[in-house]
Amino acid sequence: MRRDIPQDTVRRNEQVRAREVRVIGADGEQLGILSRNDAIAHAKELGLDLVEVAATADPPVCRVMDYGRFKYEQQKKKAEAKKNQTVIQIKEIKVRPKTDDHDYDTKVRHIRRFIEEGDRCKVTVFFRGREIVHKDRGQSILDRIVEDTKDIAKMDQEARAEGRTLFMMLAPLPKK
């Protein structure tokens, strides 16, 4: 009965399928093309594993190494790459066409904080009842927000109407 090997694992020792493999020694020197059994025997003599590093090459390339250490280093690299990823969130600020000056200033302060933290910001103007007739007021609020944040943000997406809302996206300016 043949066990299927998960995709993310590498073939080692008896799992290597090719009859002949190009072997790289433990200290990086080329040992040449050997039969699979000779390569495995050589690795076992050194107390190490024969690990397939390039399966698509002809013949496949195998390296003599400690498989446990190899897996550990792969996990460390993966963790380091994951740690260095930055997740950009989209924060949303909601305003109304009749938002007063103090409330407007508070909303702009929040937008500035989100942008400075590196997040994108969606600014939404909500219209209630008959306010929808005055879309120009909503557009003027969005234009004013763009003007007040132009030193740290750029408009990522133009103002767009959707149902009873008008929204736009702001993104941080690229760092110099």
UniProtKB/Swiss-Prot annotation:
InterPro entries membership: T_IF-3_C_sf (IPR036788), T_IF-3_N_sf (IPR036787), Translation_initiation_fac3_CS (IPR019813), Translation_initiation_fac_3 (IPR001288), Translation_initiation_fac_3_C (IPR019815), Translation_initiation_fac_3_N (IPR019814)
Keyword DNA-binding listed: no
Cellular localisation: Cytoplasm
GO MF annotation terms: ribosome binding; translation initiation factor activity
Keyword Nucleus: no
Keywords in alphabetical order: Cytoplasm, Initiation factor, Protein biosynthesis
Gene3D superfamilies recorded: Translation initiation factor 3 (IF-3), C-terminal domain, Translation initiation factor 3 (IF-3), N-terminal domain
GO biological process, one term: ribosome disassembly
Signal peptide annotation: none
GO cellular component: a single term: cytosol
Pfam families for this protein: IF3_C, IF3_N
Family: Belongs to the IF-3 family.
Function in brief: IF-3 binds to the 30S ribosomal subunit and shifts the equilibrium between 70S ribosomes and their 50S and 30S subunits in favor of the free subunits, thus enhancing the availability of 30S subunits on which protein synthesis initiation begins.
HAMAP family noted in UniProt: IF_3 (MF_00080)
Classification via PANTHER family: TRANSLATION INITIATION FACTOR IF-3 (PTHR10938), TRANSLATION INITIATION FACTOR IF-3, MITOCHONDRIAL (PTHR10938:SF0)
Description of how the protein assembles with itself and partners: Monomer.
Protein name: Translation initiation factor IF-3
Origin species: Nitratidesulfovibrio vulgaris (strain DSM 19637 / Miyazaki F) (Desulfovibrio vulgaris)
